[in-house]
A protein has these predicted regions:
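Terminal C-lobe "cap" of eukaryotic-type protein kinase domains
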Residues: 296-301, 307-317
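Activation segment/activation loop of eukaryotic-type protein kinase catalytic domains
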Residues: 131-175
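Activation segment
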Residues: 184-189
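ATP-binding glycine-rich loop module of kinase domains
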Residues: 3-63, 68-69
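C-terminal lobe substrate-recognition/regulatory segment of protein kinase catalytic domains
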Residues: 234-292
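Conserved alphaE helix
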Residues: 87-145, 288
Length: 317
């Protein structure tokens, strides 16, 4: 990709600058910050299937305030141009662990509204995680959140006739997947709801319970990320209901779930305090209720996004 890109839609010239995300296999697929006049943008060369998907999405969600869609493109080069954001939820909390609770909830509220917008046209995101939530600050010293949007639709999927998504292998980041998502079977809107609530747990201070920092140790002991995440989640949010097995309805997937359920049950027998019911008490009853609803292991009983947004937790300071 050359150092400048001309947008097909606007005719603007974007001058490529710093690398935001380096692709070691192919430098032309790296993500760059770019300038056009005094404005900052993100320039990203993408695969043809994702380019075509993005064109479809931007047509469906024109003018969205909560979804980060591209604002310009270059078809010949396969380049998309996005608005530039100051940070992500992941980086914001890592860099400022003392970010006030009300600002964290503001980001989460905006994210829930983004999910609602996707669902209104029967799309699921599949990869909801803190680094796909982009944030702008107001520029002052108070670290007020000016805006937050949901981005990165690489694996977004349009549900046809309410059918669950089934893939050849699990997709998205293992740390933020729903239990059914770990098996690559039975992924629906309810799967996104589960992932969103994991993001909420992270945002309100529970990151150490969710993040995998020891990938090399897992590999050394022959443990896959899926196994580790499932055993943790079943420990926190179990016991595993029969409804999850019915949703997955796949021999290999159900075997994985049962094996991890046995490990989780043994853990809880000796350490009952690892259940969400115990360690979430400090959140207060309203927050505890909101999170427990969305992280239920039964996909059929997770709340809709409208129910999520109507929960009293959002009105708490």
């Amino acid at each position: 990709m050359v150092s400048t890109v001309v947008g097909d839609c606007s005719g603007r010239v974007y001058v490529r600058g710093n690398v935001l995300q380096h692709n070691h296999a192919d430098d032309t697929l790296s993500i760059f910050k770019a300038k056009s006049g005094t404005e900052s943008f993100v320039v990203k060369r993408v695969s043809r299937p994702f380019y075509d998907l993005s064109i479809r999405l931007v047509a469906e969600f024109t003018g969205s305030r909560r979804l980060r869609m591209h604002v310009d493109c270059n078809q010949d080069e396969g380049v998309l141009v996005y608005p530039y954001f100051d940070s992500t939820l992941l980086a914001l909390i890592q860099n400022d662990p003392d970010l006030v609770h009300t600002q964290r909830k503001k980001i989460l509220r905006y994210t829930a509204e983004a999910i609602q917008e996707l669902y209104s046209k029967n799309w699921i995101h599949i990869d909801i995680k803190p680094d796909n939530i982009l944030v702008n600050l107001d520029g002052g010293d108070t670290k007020e959140i000016a805006n937050a949007v949901l981005g990165d639709f690489n694996i977004a999927y349009h549900l046809e006739d309410g059918k669950a998504l089934r893939t050849r292998h699990a997709i998205s980041n293992a740390m933020w997947r729903s239990p059914e998502g770990q098996t690559a079977v039975g992924v629906t809107k309810a799967s996104d709801i589960y992932s969103f609530r994991l993001v909420c747990i992270y945002a309100i201070g529970g990151g150490e319970l969710l993040l995998l920092e020891d990938y090399q140790d897992l590999v050394r002991f022959g443990i896959t990320p899926e196994q580790e995440v499932l055993s943790r989640h079943f420990t926190y949010f179990g016991p595993v209901p029969d409804a999850l097995y019915r949703r997955v309805d796949d021999e290999v997937g159900c075997a994985l779930l049962r094996d991890m359920s046995k490990i989780a049950d043994a853990t809880v027998e000796s350490q009952p305090e690892r259940r969400f019911l115990y360690w979430s008490k400090e959140l207060g009853p309203v927050a505890q209720d909101a999170i427990s609803q969305m992280t239920t292991l039964d996909p059929t009983t997770r709340p809709t996004i409208e129910q999520v947004l109507a929960h009293p937790w959002w009105q708490e300071d």
